[in-house]
A protein has these predicted regions:
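A short alpha-helical cap/connector motif
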Residues: 1-126, 133-140
Length: 140
């Protein structure tokens, strides 16, 4: 048995909503392969369960898949603040986030996280940086 087979046999199912979002992302968006998928999503959810953050910063929302997975792992009162710099993503992403089962745990913000996140005045307990890879050092 390969490691991939082992992981797939031992993680939670993706769920219908995330499956439909992943499918729509790959069918409707030009760079659909950039989306986090089942394995990455379940890992993010597990990490949130383990770390138990109150406020999560996500840089790079894209389709919202990873934001939903992060929010699934949050305890009551927790929040994911997810930033997408590309305003052309909003028409696709916002409805998926707002109609998700964890919509109340996600704040979707169009803008540059580097300048906008500090304006929120929030102490983040966890960050998932999946935006512009060329600026990772500046972002951190």
């Amino acid at each position: 048995m390969t490691i991939d087979e082992y992981i797939l046999n031992n993680i939670d199912e993706e769920g219908d909503y995330l499956y439909r979002l992943y499918r729509a992302t790959n069918v409707q968006l030009l760079h659909g392969r950039m989306a986090s998928g089942h394995l990455q999503g379940r890992l993010l959810r597990m990490l949130v369960h383990m770390i138990r953050p109150r406020n999560i910063l996500e840089v790079g929302t894209f389709s919202g898949y990873s934001a939903i997975c992060l929010a699934e792992g949050l305890e009551e009162g927790g929040k994911v603040y997810t930033f997408e710099i590309n305003d052309e993503q909003e028409d696709f992403t916002r409805p998926w986030i707002e109609q998700s089962p964890v919509a109340d745990k996600i704040e979707f913000i169009i803008g540059d996280a580097i300048t906008e996140a500090p304006r929120l005045g929030i102490d983040f307990d966890m960050a998932f940086i999946d935006g512009d890879k060329r600026t990772y050092i500046d972002t951190v």
